[in-house]
Amino acid sequence: MDQGNTAFILLAAALVLLMTPGLAFFYGGLVKAKSVISMMMMSFGAIGLIGVLWAIYGYAIAFPGAEGTIAPWSIDTGALFLNNLLETPDGAAFPPLAFVAFQATFAIITVALVSGAIADRAKFGAWMVFAGVWATVVYFPVASWVFNFGLADDGSFAYGGWLTHGLQDVFGTGVIDFAGGTAVHINAGAAALALALVLGKRVGFAKGISVPHNPPFVLLGAGLLWFGWFGFNAGSELAADGTAALAFVNTIAAPAAALLGWLVVEKIKDGKPTSVGAASGAVAGLVAITPACGSLHPLWAIVLGLIAGAVCALAIDLKFKLGFDDSLDVVGIHLVGGLIGTLYLGFLANGTGLFFSGSWSQLLVQAIAAISVLIYSFVLAFVIGFVIEKTIGFRVKNEDEIAGIDQVVHGEEGYVLADAKA
């Protein structure tokens, strides 16, 4: 067992877990002051619920081993409650539980991302029901499609879901998704779009009506997300080696370029570059580089960042043109950014991209993976959300939304600056 790599993976897991509190600040600053508690609680609720489900059965579904190389849904019953993962096989590079912890943080942040689409108007209890069901029937299986890493009987490292191993058998190459452009960002973005349609628009929804109540929170959240993203991307190599270093550098270069690209578009479009734009641009670049961070030259990572920042800055206005209320631009940043990064690899992935190999295979595989995850997640998220809305109710009453969801749902206010009563 390599103690250095084990420490690297555990540190990466801690960094990725920090991303969810970072997301809470990012989302919390973007909403109205009377919704900040509700918004942040949806992220922290995801930590609690998904952390438990992952240990009980989530890992067993997401990483079913050899049986999951082709099947779209399978389960390793021996991994339920992590029962067969407590011992480290001879020759293994690191303890299985280190990998379990690392991937748990991916499941948590993916679910939390979806919540941004339903800000200001969702019941906390209904959100928790959705989070648990969606994670079970969507995230856990989709993670197996893309990742399904595992330790073989001889302790060697093997992987392959149907989007990797299965498509490779057909096209000669599997999907390249280094850290989750499909399984995390396209997946969450598609679910966010579905929930935005199910819950409908906020009261008074219109461009310019709802402005972020706390831009410093947004910047703080973006900074924590960026910091944690080094664990997300570099940690996905599962070894402290040259590929991890490449992923680390690209996690600096792409979001930095995206930040600039977003600000340029914002200046041209709206007349002023904003702090929220800078934060959103950085996140858009982080999303786009996620699938590509280990497979791109840094120069092409910068180009990807510029494209993602500029396109996502334009994409966030689609909700006003198309009439859906994606409150915090999960669709415009995560779905669009994830699609850009995933498809970009079809052209410029080292060795297999169209511009390097002359073959369309990688681009075709990337498109199949992106579309498959998008459709699967959207359809099931819509069905789950619709059933919740028609049974226990997903959306608060309009008068409660106007009064302030924090008080109605949680009995708290985000900014009570007064001495506590004795």
Where are these regions (language model features)?
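Glycine- and aromatic-enriched membrane alpha-helices
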Residues: M1-A422
